[in-house]
Amino acid sequence: YLAETRNFDGTAVVIFQPAEEGGGGGREMVADGMMERFGIQEVYGMHNMPGIPVGTFAIRPGAMMAAADQFDVTVTGKGGHAAKPHDCVDSVLVAAQIVVALQSIASRNVDALKEVVVSVCTVATESDSYNVIPQSVTLKGTVRTLDPKVQDFVEDRIKAVVTGIAGALGATAEIDYRRGYPVTMNAEGPTGHAAEVARQIAGDCDMGVAPMMGAEDFSFMLNERPGAYI
C-alpha cells in the first residue's frame, strides 16, 4: 500500500520484535521510549495461526491472548530411607498433593465463565534414587488468565494452597511467583480497522474467534498505545 500510495499522509514504523519467546523484548522496547521516540500513535501486530482456514484472518476486540505468569515452589521436608517413611517428612508426597490441589483453583475457586489455566510443568528433586525420600522437591509452572482480577485472585490462592498443604503435612514451602506478559488487549476502533483491511485483502475476517490462552509480549505495546493484534 505504501509503495502504491506515495502521498501517504503519516509515518509507518516497522517494529522488529526481539526476544518475544520469554524474553519480554516488547517490555524493554517500551521502557526504552520506543513509542515516544518514533511518535507512534497506534500499534498493530500480526501472527500466523495454524488451525484457521488458509487465506483468512481472525481477530476480536478485547482480550485476544492471555496474561502469562510463572511460579517456582520449593517443598522442604525431612529426607530419609524409603523403608522408614515414618521417620521422614515426605517432600514428594507433599508436592504431589500440592500439584493436585492447585487444579481446584480453576475448577472450584474461579467462576466457570472466567478463563484460567494453572499448569505445573516441572517436578524435580536432587535425588534419582529408588529408595531415598528426598529432602526437597521443586515445582515449576505457569498461570494463564484473561482478567486482571482473576490474575490477582489466582496468585493469592496458589500461595495459600502451597503453604497450607505443606504446613498441614509437616513440611515447609517457599514460592516465587512472577508476573509475566499482560493480557493482549485489542482496542475497539483499531480492531475494526484491522478487520476491514483484512477483508479487503482476503475477503473475510472472523471477528468471533475465541481468546487464546497463549501469551504475547506485543501486549506491552498495547498497554502503551491503542491498537490490535490479528
Language model feature labels by segment:
Residues 93-230:
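Metal-dependent amide/peptide-bond hydrolase catalytic core
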Residues 2-134, 215-216:
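Histidine/acidic-residue-rich, glycine-tolerant segments that coordinate divalent metal ions
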